[in-house]
């Protein structure tokens, strides 16, 4: 099954015939694989490790914050994260060929209609199809934008983080400020943490870096599926002179060993909707990833049904802290 966006692209197969192609943005299906039989070459640039890992067995994949691959046609899948879209498109335009051809496709509810406004200063753009509640735009590059990744880095500090400075790139959760859920979870972290600590779904690395800052004796590992999050977490650790391992993993897919503490502010948004797959997998498998007497500590929106999941797999749970919006849950192996 292919996405709505890919169904629209499927109506324009002649554009792809005998061309070198780069798929980028929010592409998340097998359309790049299907198109291989008519294209000259197909490369995928994805920021999402779960998708990149799956596609890597079928086609060439670039899992990285940056991409300098040059092709005949770029196929960009619009996402709802405007900062992420702008970062990716400006980079693609800056690295594109003369008269670079780009197809931009996306669901209307994700804001694809703003493609014309974003790109019109750099070339000719127009809508060529509208179907499946999606828009498809054709763009031809005339003027390259200046792109400097250093201009996209953001930093912030917060009294709740002591002297920690957080570094983040576009597309990373809570890139501009400390979010309420993470702040509540931070309030439960003390200076008595020992052993191996896993920050799962680390984002810019706030939780893992704070644990290491407050507990230098702890060994921390930070993981995420998002390329920009991993780059941000690495810099947050480095700039604060904190030691830690940063690893790409889809929940526990590429994590080895067991931990004394697993902490997480797990995402529950998947695209436009809400999804619990990652959180369900986290809670289900955490029991086998904890050392004896190890602890899983997560923060979540209070309305989410995590207590039932925790009780199902651990027998019981504790609420360590709560506000009107969030709760911090703790379970032990």
From Swiss-Prot:
Keyword list, A-Z: Cytoplasm, Methyltransferase, rRNA processing, S-adenosyl-L-methionine, Transferase
Biological role: Specifically methylates the guanine in position 1207 of 16S rRNA in the 30S particle.
CC per GO annotation: cytoplasm
PANTHER family in the cross-refs: RIBOSOMAL RNA SMALL SUBUNIT METHYLTRANSFERASE C
SUPFAM superfamilies: S-adenosyl-L-methionine-dependent methyltransferases
Keyword RNA-binding: no
Subunit structure and binding partners: Monomer.
Protein name as catalogued: Ribosomal RNA small subunit methyltransferase C
GO molecular function: 16S rRNA (guanine(1207)-N(2))-methyltransferase activity; nucleic acid binding
Subcellular location: Cytoplasm
Recorded catalytic activity of this chain's protein: guanosine(1207) in 16S rRNA + S-adenosyl-L-methionine = N(2)-methylguanosine(1207) in 16S rRNA + S-adenosyl-L-homocysteine + H(+)
EC code(s) of this entry: 2.1.1.172
Family: Belongs to the methyltransferase superfamily. RsmC family.
Pfam families: MTS, MTS_N
Primary localization class, coarse: cytoplasm
Record keyword NAD present: no
